[in-house]
From Swiss-Prot:
Keywords: ATP synthesis, ATP-binding, Cell inner membrane, Cell membrane, CF(1), Hydrogen ion transport, Ion transport, Membrane, Nucleotide-binding, Translocase, Transport. HAMAP family: ATP_synth_beta_bact. ATP binds at G160, G161, A162, G163, V164, G165, K166, T167. Its EC number is 7.1.2.2. SUPFAM superfamilies: C-terminal domain of alpha and beta subunits of F1 ATP synthase, N-terminal domain of alpha and beta subunits of F1 ATP synthase, P-loop containing nucleoside triphosphate hydrolases. Coiled coil: none annotated. It holds the Pfam family ATP-synt_ab. The lineage of its organism: Bacteria, Pseudomonadati, Myxococcota, Myxococcia, Myxococcales. InterPro entries: AAA+_ATPase, ATP-synt_VA_C, ATP_synth_F1_bsu, ATPase_a/bsu_AS, ATPase_alpha/beta_chains, ATPase_F1/V1/A1_a/bsu_N, ATPase_F1/V1/A1_a/bsu_N_sf, ATPase_F1/V1/A1_a/bsu_nucl-bd. This is ATP synthase subunit beta. It is found in: Cell inner membrane.
Length: 481
């Protein structure tokens, strides 16, 4: 911005989170520019409230969306034009910290000593820099790696109700990326409950992913826009977190895991902002720019020649209606879905991932290889046949089944138990040390079960184990006891 352009304006109207600001002639800031104003109700600091320009209302007036509470603002108050979009700190100084939408720390551990600040509005990587190779992202979790594998630089939708283990699965993924791959994780709490965000922070401390006594050794950043915050904050916090992840990918060349909980609330906040700006709503009351906003976020999540951002996004489905525009728009971008099922959790099989409902675009022999594909399809076939037989078993009992079907049921029950796995972050629940299972060991184990190599081993030996060698060892101990 040139030196001749005035940088000060004044508030002329406050309507909830919408603030109209008037500037002198020739000083109109661009759309997405961050403006600063002092709100004494928030803190004693100067310029403590950020406003983002959303519309030009005339030659000298802009309509802005506030990133925090506007209580305490009044007409005539001075507003400073920063001349740039919202800038957030990036780099290793952010590790181990809890930040808000504007990159300010909310963990009471002092300022973030970042060397660089990046704009949250960025273009996706150009085609020439994107990595076009389709590669599998190994998680070390058997059920995911075998049946619904993740794509490096892909987007995964995580569906799960309350209490089925969604948070534990997220934490295990964060732990595995940090410890097994030396990667970083960025967690975006979009419309998060404050309690859930607090719980996640303390659980990350317990697993040493965040080390408050040595922040440089931490391997995760938490960025929260809580559900009590204005829609402007909730609509932008995912972009703030993504910007921090992009730095680790593009500058440090790392494989980064980006968690967004919940992507529906990102859309919901955008809908609120759209209504506040007076736009005519589209289908089911959503903003007319729904697909554009979602695409702007999702297209930045990709692999480049330097590194990758793999995103796991929790998706709330309103009234279980998958045709609702919000989840339907998100589905178009997903490479894999991981569905957590309460009926599986009730069997005490954790992670409670549904092996038949979870999907992946890369479950294809051209990508994962013929052996992996063949074993995955064989396992799914056995589980599907078992599902079909369950009504007959419930009514008539096992004795009415043919010998072939009895064998299918026996193998399916072993597969079901072998899909369970002790997690590092869940040792307090299971009493067992966690297991990271390499992909080849996963394929080999399920191949042997499906082929009947372990038909003589009791079901109990398969429960909460890592590799098939551990199952054989369990069976030997059971036989000796």
């Amino acid at each position: 911005m040139s030196a001749q352009v005035p940088t000060a304006g004044r508030i002329i109207q406050v309507l909830g989170p919408v603030v109209d600001v008037e500037f002198p002639p020739g000083g109109l800031p661009e759309v997405y520019t961050a403006l600063k104003v002092t709100n004494a109700n928030l803190s004693a600091a100067a310029d403590n409230l950020t406003l983002e320009v959303a519309q030009h209302l005339g030659e000298n007036t802009v309509r802005t969306i506030a990133m925090d509470s506007t209580e305490g603002l009044g007409r005539g108050m001075a507003v400073t034009n920063t001349g740039a979009p919202i800038q957030v700190p990036v780099g290793k100084a952010t590790l181990g910290r809890i930040l808000n939408v504007t990159g300010e720390p909310v963990d009471e551990m002092g300022p973030v000593k970042a060397q660089e600040y990046w704009s949250i509005h960025r273009a996706p990587p150009p085609f020439t820099e994107q990595d076009v190779r389709v590669q599998m992202f190994e998680t070390g979790i058997k059920v995911i790696d075998l049946l619904a594998p993740y794509t490096r630089g892909g987007k995964i939708g995580l569906f799960g109700g309350a209490g089925v283990g969604k948070t534990v699965l997220l934490q295990e993924l964060i732990r595995n990326v940090a410890v097994e791959r030396g990667g970083f994780s960025v967690f975006a709490g979009v419309g998060e409950r404050t309690r859930e965000g607090n719980d996640l922070y303390h659980e990350m401390q317990d697993t040493k992913v965040i080390q408050t006594d040595n922040l440089e050794a931490s391997q995760a950043v938490l960025v929260y826009g809580q559900m009590n915050e204005p829609p402007g904050a909730r609509a932008r916090v995912a972009l703030s977190a993504l910007t921090m992840a992009e730095y680790f990918r593009d500058v440090e060349g790392r494989d980064v895991l980006l968690f967004v909980d919940n992507i529906f609330r990102f859309t919901q906040a955008g809908s609120e902002v759209s209504a506040l700006l007076g736009r005519i709503p589209s289908a089911v009351g959503y903003q007319p720019t729904l697909a554009t906003e979602m695409g702007g976020l999702q297209e930045r999540i990709t692999s480049t020649t330097k590194g990758s951002i793999t995103s796991v996004q929790a998706i709330y489905v309103p009234a279980d209606d998958l045709t609702d525009p919000a989840p339907a728009t998100a589905f178009a971008h997903l490479d894999a879905t991981t569905v957590l099922n309460r009926s599986i959790a009730e069997l005490a099989i954790f992670p409670a991932v549904d092996p038949l409902d979870s999907t992946s675009r890369i479950l294809d022999p051209a990508v994962i290889g013929a052996e992996h594909y063949g074993v995955a399809r064989k396992v799914q076939g056995i589980l599907q046949r078992y599902k079909e037989l369950q009504d007959i078993i419930a009514i008539l009992g096992m004795d009415e089944l043919s010998e072939d079907d009895k064998l299918v049921v026996a193998r399916a029950r072993k597969i079901q138990r072998f899909l369970s796995q002790p997690f590092f972050v869940a040792k307090v629940f299971t009493g067992k040390d966690g297991r990271y299972v390499k992909l080849q060991d996963t394929i080999q184990g399920f191949k042997e079960i499906a082929e009947g190599k372990h038909d003589d081993i009791p079901e109990g030996a398969f429960y909460m184990t890592g590799s098939i060698d551990e199952v054989v060892e369990n069976a030997r101990k059971l036989a000796a006891s």
